[in-house]
Amino acid sequence: MNEELAAYITHLCELSGHTTQIDDDVILVEPSKDLIYDAFTTRKDRYAYGHVERYSFGGAEFSSASFEIFKKFAIMHFAADI
């Protein structure tokens, strides 16, 4: 993940009140006390987005209201790669 993208995503997280930390190519996002999400990372030449342990595009956590900003950014980011 390039530094500019990492900084942008981290800034979006902070604006929405989330805590972030960068670990290698993974931006960990903590939206609440008990839940830690992986905002963006690369897995086998593709982008993954979702829960840090599943790297999935589905599930109840992915559709939560507090996570809408990340879904919208993911759509824009994927569209740029098409």
Task: Name what the model sees in each region.
Residues 58-66:
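Short alpha-helix boundary/capping segments
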Residues 65-82:
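Surface-exposed beta-loop interaction hotspot
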Residues 32-59, 77:
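Short aromatic-glycine-(Arg/Gly/Cys) micro-motifs in beta-strand/loop hairpins
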Residues 1-42:
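N-terminal "first-domain core" detector
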Residues 6, 45-48, 63-64:
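Broad hydrophobic/π-residue packing in well-ordered secondary structure
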